[in-house]
Amino acid sequence: MVNVPKTRKTYCKGKACRKHSQHKVTQYKAGKASLYAQGKRRYDRKQSGFGGQTKQIFHKKAKTTKKVVLRLECMSCKTKTQLALKRCKHFELGGEKKQKGQALQF
């Protein structure tokens, strides 16, 4: 389980800052795929009409997790950067901090 705080003080590459400043942390989420990208237009054209499936569908998935990507937004200059973490099964943003000597909570 990875628990990341909602704010973090880190270096900002923005032209206005170029120093360590407070950043707002969110989890990156992929946008919706465009219908007008060249590959999608070609695929749809090829699929239309008779003849069934024209390109192979990938089935041999090897990975069980995805790498978590953090989106860091500088609170002073609003510059956004992305930071990739290691793979993990459980990711939590802004969860409760663990206390020393406490009983495990399930």
Curated annotation (Swiss-Prot):
It comes from Kluyveromyces marxianus. GO terms for cellular component: ribonucleoprotein complex; ribosome. SUPFAM superfamilies: Zn-binding ribosomal proteins. One of its GO terms (biological process) is translation. InterPro entries: Ribosomal_eL44, Ribosomal_LSU_eL42, Ribosomal_zn-bd. Keywords: Antibiotic resistance, Cycloheximide resistance, Ribonucleoprotein, Ribosomal protein. It comes from the Eukaryota. Gene3D superfamilies: 3.10.450.80. Confers resistance to cycloheximide, an inhibitor of polypeptide elongation. PROSITE patterns: RIBOSOMAL_L44E (PS01172). GO terms for molecular function: structural constituent of ribosome. The lineage of its organism: Eukaryota, Fungi, Dikarya, Ascomycota, Saccharomycotina. Belongs to the eukaryotic ribosomal protein eL42 family. This is Large ribosomal subunit protein eL42. The keyword Protein biosynthesis does not apply. The gene is RPL44.
